[in-house]
C-alpha cells in the first residue's frame, strides 16, 4: 500500500507485479512476469534470500533495472548473500547511516557502543535499538505519576517532540512511526554499504501522458 500511495502522489503506476511463496526462493515465475514489462525499477518487499535469488536471476536474464529493497530485508544479510551481484542494489533504511558520525545522534551512538564493547560493529539494528532506548529514557524523565505502561504511552503520545542528538521524533495516537525520514543506502562492489546523499534524475519511459512505469515484487 505504501508503494502504491507514493507512486500515485507522483502520477506513477505499477506496470507489473510478481509474487513468491513465503519461506521459499522459487522466484522464476515472478521474474518472468515482471521482465515482460521492461521496468526501470523493481521495488522488492521480502526476505533477503528470495530477494537475492531474484536479483541474481534477473541479472542472468539481463533485466536492466534498479533493484530497491526496504529495510526489512536486512542490509548486511542481503549484501553477503548477493556477493558481487549486489553492486548498486538500493536498500531503504528507517534510521540514519550508522557510520555517519557527522550526525550528532550517530556520534553519540558510537560513543555509547564503544563504552559498552569496543569490538561491536555499528549497524542499523543496534542504532535503531539505541534510539528506542534513548526515547524510553527521555519519556521516563517526563512521565508524571506511576511508571505504568499506560502512563508511559500517554507521555510518549502527548509530550513530544523528542529531540535526540539533533533528530526529532514525534508520536500520537495511531502514529507510532516517530520519524518520517527515509534513508537510502546502496551496496558497493565489495559488499559494503554506502549512504545515498543525493539522487540523480532517471531517464524514464513514458507510458501515457505524464505516467511513468515502475513495478513491485513481494
What is each stretch, according to the model?
Residues 17-18, 197-199:
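Short hydrophobic alpha-helix segments
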Residues 20-23, 47-48, 71, 129, ...:
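Short beta->alpha junction loops/turns
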Residues 35-36, 60-62, 81-85, 147-150, ...:
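Extracellular/periplasmic catalytic domains that process cell-envelope and extracellular macromolecules
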Amino acid at each position: 500500500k505504501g508503494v502504491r500511495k507514493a507512486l500515485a502522489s507522483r502520477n506513477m503506476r505499477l506496470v507489473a507485479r510478481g509474487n513468491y511463496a513465503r519461506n521459499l526462493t522459487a522466484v522464476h515465475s515472478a521474474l518472468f512476469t515482471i521482465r515482460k514489462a521492461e521496468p526501470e525499477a523493481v521495488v522488492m518487499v521480502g526476505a533477503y534470500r528470495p530477494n537475492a535469488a531474484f536479483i541474481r536471476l534477473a541479472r542472468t536474464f539481463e533485466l536492466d533495472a534498479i533493484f530497491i529493497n526496504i529495510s526489512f530485508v536486512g542490509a548486511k544479510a542481503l549484501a553477503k548473500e548477493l556477493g558481487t551481484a549486489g553492486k548498486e542494489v538500493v536498500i531503504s533504511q528507517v534510521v540514519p547511516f550508522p557510520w555517519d558520525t557527522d550526525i550528532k545522534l550517530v556520534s553519540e551512538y558510537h560513543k555509547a557502543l564503544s563504552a559498552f564493547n569496543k569490538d561491536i560493529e555499528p549497524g542499523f539494528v543496534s542504532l535503531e535499538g539505541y534510539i528506542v532506548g534513548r526515547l524510553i529514557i527521555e519519556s521516563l524523565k517526563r512521565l508524571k505519576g506511576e511508571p505504568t505502561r499506560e502512563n508511559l504511552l500517554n507521555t510518549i503520545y502527548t509530550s513530544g517532540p523528542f529531540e535526540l542528538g539533533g533528530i526529532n521524533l514525534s508520536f500520537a495516537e495511531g502514529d507510532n512511526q516517530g520519524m518520517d525520514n527515509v534513508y537510502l543506502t546502496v551496496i558497493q562492489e565489495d559488499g559494503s554499504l554506502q549512504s545515498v546523499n543525493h539522487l540523480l534524475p532517471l531517464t524514464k519511459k513514458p507510458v501515457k501522458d505524464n505516467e511513468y512505469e515502475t513495478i513491485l515484487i513481494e
